[in-house]
């Protein structure tokens, strides 16, 4: 058994999400990064209003569990979906997608995924444009 104690500094401190992966302010609290042979990664991800991921995919898929606020998610070519606390989202392996907060509300989710044999958890693509985020006219501002 291994216990990792919570601390204000160190390996489980909150970090700001990198600009290469996110638009807007996103903060990440690591929950689990289990040592091999486990492949599990878990992060509590905090999106400020309007913040979102870039397009990306996961070699082994991803599960999201919304804990606070109201969010948006979309798979490439699909409609923008509104997600709320208690909602669970499963993203298929290699499915391009993005997720984030609505323009007027924050959103927090628990992100669960695994690393592949090369220790890769995600493949990052281009940023989601404002037109893509706004659904080319879809009104998500009241969500």
Positions of PLM-derived features:
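A short, N-terminal "cap"/entry segment at the start of jelly-roll beta-barrel domains
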Residues: 1-39, 121-143
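Conserved short histidine dyad/triad with adjacent acidic residue
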Residues: 27-30, 43-58, 93
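Short, conserved beta-strand element in jelly-roll/cupin
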Residues: 44-48, 57-73, 112-115
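Short beta-strand His + acidic residue motifs that chelate non-heme Fe in jelly-roll/DSBH
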Residues: 53-56, 73-74, 91, 96-103
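A short hydrophobic beta-strand segment most commonly corresponding to one strand
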Residues: 63, 90, 104-123
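Short acidic-glycine-tyrosine-enriched beta hairpin
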Residues: 77-94
């Amino acid at each position: 058994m291994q216990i990792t104690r919570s601390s204000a500094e160190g390996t489980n401190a909150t970090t700001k999400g990198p600009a290469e992966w996110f638009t807007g302010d996103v903060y990440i609290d690591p929950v689990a990064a289990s040592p091999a042979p486990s492949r599990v990664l878990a992060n509590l991800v905090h999106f400020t209003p309007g913040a979102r991921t870039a397009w990306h995919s996961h070699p082994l898929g991803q599960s999201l569990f919304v804990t606070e606020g109201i969010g948006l998610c979309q798979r490439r070519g699909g409609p923008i979906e509104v997600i709320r606390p208690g909602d669970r989202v499963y993203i298929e392996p290699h499915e391009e997608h993005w997720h984030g907060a609505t323009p007027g509300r924050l959103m927090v989710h628990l992100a669960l995924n695994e690393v592949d044999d090369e220790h890769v958890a995600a493949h990052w693509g281009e940023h989601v444009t404002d037109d893509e985020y706004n659904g080319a006219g879809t009104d998500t501002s009241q969500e």
